[in-house]
Amino acid sequence: MLAAVAVGAVGLGAVFVDGAPFWGADGGGPPALLPGLAYLVLAILGVRMTWRRGAIIAGVTAGLFLLVAFLDSLRAPDSQSHLGRFFDSMLAGEAMDIIVRKGQQNLSILFGNYKLALLVPVALVFVIYVLARPTSWGSRALQRSFDSAPTLRPGLIALLVTLTIGFLINDSGVAIPANGALIAVPLIITVAVGTLLDEARMTGATRAARRR
């Protein structure tokens, strides 16, 4: 319970800083962060994710986004962030134009380089496969890490959820999973290697004790 509270507090703080109009004013960050955070908190509490719970999380995320955008739209035009301006565009019937333009920007970045166009979906599918079957593809060290740190696997799944949503809804889409991987992959390798080293030390200590 304490772990879930700690994760929720840190995560909500990050969402607030990222999405608050007077700070980050990021329209694409909170909708990507909240579902991953919700999944992680539920997983720590032992609550199984279902389609219904996923739909509720999506609805709450969309509602909070619209609420923040609405509150920002109440400020003076010169003080509004793009969240408030987006809400005003919804009232004016121009929101779809913005969504289409951002989608086109994302697609142009993705398909402007065919290597990236192939790499991103393949990489996401590979990560999903490894998380589903962590003993495959030589990743037994990852399974051992999952065994020694029960929150590691839910954390990686939450990260995957956040990066995937961020990839889909941001106009800089392909940069989201790329930057996330730059941070996550070295940390994952460090955890896996640390687990193997701990096991090696324990094995060595056991053998030394038997020889005495």
Where do the model's predicted regions map?
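Membrane-interfacial, low-structure loops and terminal tails that flank and connect transmembrane helices
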Residues: 1-2, 135-150, 201-212
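Membrane-interfacial entry segments at the cytosolic side of transmembrane helices
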Residues: 2-3, 46-59
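Hydrophobic membrane-spanning alpha-helices of multi-pass integral membrane proteins
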Residues: 6-15, 33-37, 58-65, 93-97, ...
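Membrane-interface helix caps and helix-loop-helix hairpins in membrane proteins
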Residues: 18-27, 168-175
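Aromatic-rich transmembrane-lumenal/periplasmic boundary elements in polytopic membrane proteins
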Residues: 28, 54-92
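Alpha-helical transmembrane segments
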Residues: 40-44, 66-70, 125-136, 187-200
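Juxtamembrane membrane-water interface segments that cap and precede transmembrane helices
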Residues: 91-114
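Alpha-helical transmembrane segments at the extracellular/periplasmic loop-to-helix junctions
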Residues: 108-135
